[in-house]
Amino acid sequence: MRHLLLATTAVAVVLGGTMAARADMAAAEKFLAEEINGLSVLSADEQKAEMQFFIDAAKPFTNLEIKVVSETIATHEYESKVLAPAFTAITGIKVTHDLIGEGDVVEKLQTQMQSGENIYDGYVNDSDLIGTHWRYQQVRNLTDWRAGEGKDVTLPTLDIADFIGTSFTTAPDGKLYQLPDQQFANLYWFRYDWFNDEQNKADFKAKYGYDLGVPVNWSAYQDIAEFFTGRDLSRLGVEGKVYGNMDYGKKDPSLGWRYTDAWMSMAGMGDKGEPNGLPVDEWGIRGNEGAQPTGSCVARGGATNSPAAVYAVEKAIEWLQKYSPPEAAGMPFGEAGPIPAQCNGAQQMFWYTAFTAATVKPDLPVMNEDGTPKWRMAPSPHGAYWSEGTKIGYQDAGSWTLMKSTPVDRAKAAWLYAQFVTSKTVDLKKADVGLTFIRESTINSDHFTERAPKLGGLIEFYRSPARVQWSPTGTNVPDYPKLAQLWWQNIGDAMSGAKTAQEALDSLCAAQESVLARLERAGVQGDLGPKLNEEKGADHWLAQPGSPKAKLENEKPKGQTIAYDELI
């Protein structure tokens, strides 16, 4: 690698001009020394070799101004404020990395898809859109890009095999459509210290007949929520009312993700399968063997309005009303996420690990003096309709996406930036800040072995083979932007009480089928587009094996728990 460094440096000096090459490498060396500061899985020489590649590959684009966009989370803030200016200094490509809401990212992307106008040169777009991108073919697939048009700007040491989320961004055609930039799962969060308190353990066992521990099923989660809500924990130094659940319920785009992000599969609505249920996925959309969506309502073989889906929504509403802070019902995702760190919540079933960085700050009431957390994260419990082999949770994989409507020079410059912020040189430091892991080499680094005790189970989760059971939206969803907006609007009606859960889900599945029917009529997705089943009625489909599933006589079986220390 050192020989490569010397050779590429020599070429840069001869071809690019001695002063310019030195200036670029000077900026790179400053970045490596002051920002990376040894926190990389690569050696110093290997880091410099990667920087030299970026310097050389960027020469045709010097002074080109590009714009990229992502949602606003800690990882992307670090990219926008630290990595983007460093990339500009090193390469001469002037990159503006905008931070906007996740719903706005999807809206901008949808506008670019519909208009053909180049709004952004690169998007960090959730892999939930893999089915959309595969069908519309409006993004550059990165398999062909890296071998063809983008070959001269592809980092030789990118090492696609090191990325843990490429199964989420690869379509059934075997092509990679997006490059993961950050990933986070939704897991179960709980107060480890409260659960291990002897008085709490004894009182819980006396009341419910089984041990207080990490809930395996929703029945146990509900019992624990009931047990802690209103419980006096002043003897543990806890002031104010204690709550047994935290969630959010504002009628806002983030309410849609709350349900499409695998809540229904956690309840047991969909079919078995990894990374997503087939033929019925966690949106309740049924697909045929040719990957064509065939229905969403039970009458067409879908499950969006099935008994399991109704159960999923009713339980969330019940727990929000009975066991959560009153203000939670009016909160969106962004406001609710940091709340557990404020001390008075016992547990949260649907907690995004993207909030880990904000929840391990040393001055928080949920942290011990030695820097270890009073809380832990664990696998989420499953609902009454769930069975082994069914998806158990969601994992967000925000991934670099290059639109075909972006001019090639701008796409190449954006691709260089995308690789810079996901490179092995940078990734360990970026993960140390944002804790949203994308590379195996970073997860398994000595650095995170040392940090693991202070991260509440995050490293143990990502080092576990079970992590593949947490996955993003799959390929049954043919047009994510059009379908996603239907969820928050209809679920919002159930949350507000304007409709029952059944009525809201009947409306939702009908609205989804309306979109599927329009796509089928338009024929814009060819052989991969929807092909709706004839309606056969709910009784026919509920009698078939798999999803949709008939209503259970008992939706609250006995609670089951497991001790956290035994679990890990």
Range-by-range predicted roles:
Residues T170, G174, Q321-S324, P362-T442, ...:
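Extracytoplasmic/periplasmic substrate-recognition and gating elements
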Residues M51-A57, A74-G92, W189, D193-F195, ...:
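Short, polar/charged alpha-helical segment
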